[in-house]
Structure formats: C-alpha cells, structure tokens
Amino acid sequence: MKNRVTGLGGFFFKTRNPDQIKEWYKNHLGIPTDQYGWTFWWKDENGNKCSTQWSPFKEDTTYFSPSEKQFMMNFRVENLKELLKVLKEEGVTIIGEIEEYDYGKFGWILDPEGNKIELWEPVGSVFLEDKDL
C-alpha cells in the first residue's frame, strides 16, 4: 500500500475541565475555541483544503478506550478499508468496526504501547464546502 497516512487529522486529550482549559488556550495562546475545541484549516502541498482538529475531552471519557492514555491522535488516510485490512495482516490490533458519517469514515487501532490511534478518511466535499482557504 503506497500512501497510508496523509497528515495529522487531530489531537485529542483528556482534562479535568475542558471548558476551563479551552479558555486558558484562548486567553494565553490566542486559540479561538468552539464546543469541540478548534479546527485549524490549511492547504496541503497540492492545494487541497485540509483541517486538523484540536479537542480537549473530559478526563472520564471512554472515547479513548481501551487505551488508558491521556491523549489520542487522529491521522488522515486515503483508503481506510484497505489500510485496516493491511494493518490487520501485519498484526496490528484493530479496535471496533469502521464507522461512516457524512464527513468521513473512521477506524481505530492500538500502537505497541497501547495508544489508541484514530484513522480518518475524510469526505472533503461535505466537510470543507463552506471553507474559503
């Protein structure tokens, strides 16, 4: 498989108080936030519109399970179904089933240290249609 990961889709982390931490990042680092955190919009080397999501989660979230780590990374991929098939053949632990939404497909794996990694195959036309970059 030629292209596996095409970019960083997001960085998610646990915190005691997501609203308070978003306010801190807004006040001290100038990151405007919304209910999910913040989406950084950018263009790749070919001029395609892209995004990276930064999101604090409540410390008791189960979204990172079965990992017990304080963070989870999301990587953008081109062909999630094929990639998960290849990763499974390589012995990588796959978590759950592929989930599909109007903005993309998602799958999850564990790295050797138990970090849950989210893989995202975005659907750009739906997710980016109102963004003027």
Which residue ranges define each predicted feature?
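Vicinal oxygen chelate
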Residues: R16-Q20, S67-E68, M72-K116
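N-terminal beta-strand motif that seeds the catalytic metal site of vicinal oxygen chelate
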Residues: M1-K22, Q70-F75, V123-L133
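Conserved beta-strand in the GNAT
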Residues: T52-S55, W108, E118
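Active-site beta-strand termini and strand-to-loop segments that position acidic
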Residues: W42-G47, I109-P112, P122
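Core segments of cupin and vicinal oxygen chelate
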Residues: K2-T6, F12-S55, E89
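Short, flexible, solvent-exposed loop/turn segments with mixed acidic/basic and small polar residues
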Residues: M1-K2, D60-S65
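Acetyl-CoA-dependent GNAT
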Residues: K58-D60, G96, E121-V123
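A short acidic/small-residue loop/turn micro-motif
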Residues: Y36, D102, V123-V126
